[in-house]
Curated annotation (Swiss-Prot):
Pfam families: AA_kinase. Pathway: Amino-acid biosynthesis; L-proline biosynthesis; L-glutamate 5-semialdehyde from L-glutamate: step 1/2. One of its GO terms (molecular function) is ATP binding. It is an enzyme of class 2 (transferase). The keyword Methyltransferase does not apply. This is Glutamate 5-kinase 2. NCBIfam families: proB. Keywords: Amino-acid biosynthesis, ATP-binding, Cytoplasm, Kinase, Nucleotide-binding, Proline biosynthesis, Transferase. The gene is proB2.
Length: 284
């Protein structure tokens, strides 16, 4: 009986994935860049892009939100042997963003797609006119065969006004783009009852339909391993996206062909909103 229920749940989630008209795929720093060297993981990125191309081939649209600029540019500051100051992180982001986009562009080009870089700030996503302009830009890029690849403009953002992590940026992009599904690729399989690194008996939560105080406590027990975000920020992102009527998946992204893995039933946590359109859908 339990196996039958599991198969039914998997089939339902697969349908949601295959039927999503527009998807946002967020890629964490720990997934796209080597944690020690900051080098872009080119072979892995190629498998992700092959997944993205396959989605486009069956009539779906994909918008990418990527972290990794600071990681890719930080090797210029290795001699400091300490945590980077704000201005150093901004410089690292400016250097690394170019490397990051070149890697994406080269991989997309091999499959006949262009790339459209979009750098957003908190002011952009908080302003209705900017949101509408961004939505129009996303659509025009998709119309001409260019995949929007989005990052926060870390080179100019300050702690007072920055979004702070790309999980919430991805959720706001999902609002703006009227996406049906937000996929958060991370260094963990999903939401656990406790931190699985500390407690091997921790259980993964396969599905969340309402973010309760208990769910928030679970998220607080799952700290980030790398990057600026953790499970708490992913839960924040899930709440934002669910309020816009968008399904959310948290899954481990470090494996090759990470989107195909989700499609084939790899461990993940799905956040499923009520089956209705909400007033906030579209970020208006």
């Amino acid at each position: 009986m339990q196996e039958k229920i599991r198969e039914t749940c998997l089939a339902t989630k697969t349908v949601k994935l295959l039927s999503a008209r527009r998807l946002i795929v967020k890629i964490g720093s720990a997934v796209v860049a080597d944690a020690e060297t900051g080098e872009i993981r080119g072979p892995w990125l190629e498998t992700l892009i092959k997944d993205v191309v396959r989605f486009f081939a069956r009539g779906q649209q994909v918008i990418i939100v990527t972290s990794g600029a600071v990681a890719a540019g930080s090797r210029h500051f290795k001699q400091l042997d300490r945590s980077l100051r704000i201005e150093e992180k901004q410089a690292a982001a400016a250097i690394g963003q170019i490397r990051l986009m070149i890697a994406y562009e080269q991989s997309l080009k091999r499959h006949g797609f262009g790339l459209g870089q979009v750098l957003l700030t908190s002011a952009d996503v908080d302003n209705q006119r900017c949101r509408l302009n961004a939505r129009s830009a996303f659509q025009q890029l998709l119309n001409v065969g260019a995949v929007p690849v989005i990052n926060e403009n870390d080179a100019t953002a300050t702690p007072e006004v920055c979004l702070g992590d790309n999980d919430r940026l991805a959720a706001r992009v999902a609002q703006i783009a009227k996406a049906d599904l937000l996929i958060l690729l991370s260094d963990v399989d999903g939401l656990f009852t406790e931190d699985p690194h500390d407690n091997p008996l921790a259980r993964m939560i396969p599905e969340v339909r309402r973010i309760t105080p208990e769910i928030e406590i679970m998220a607080s027990l799952s700290p980030a391993r790398h990057g600026s975000g953790g499970m708490v920020t992913k839960l924040m992102a899930a709440r934002i996206a669910m309020e816009a009527g968008c399904n959310v998946v948290i899954a481990k992204g470090s494996k090759s062909y990470p989107l195909a893995a989700i499609e084939n039933g790899a461990p993940s946590t799905w956040f499923i909103p009520p089956a209705r359109e909400t007033a906030t859908r579209g970020g208006r």
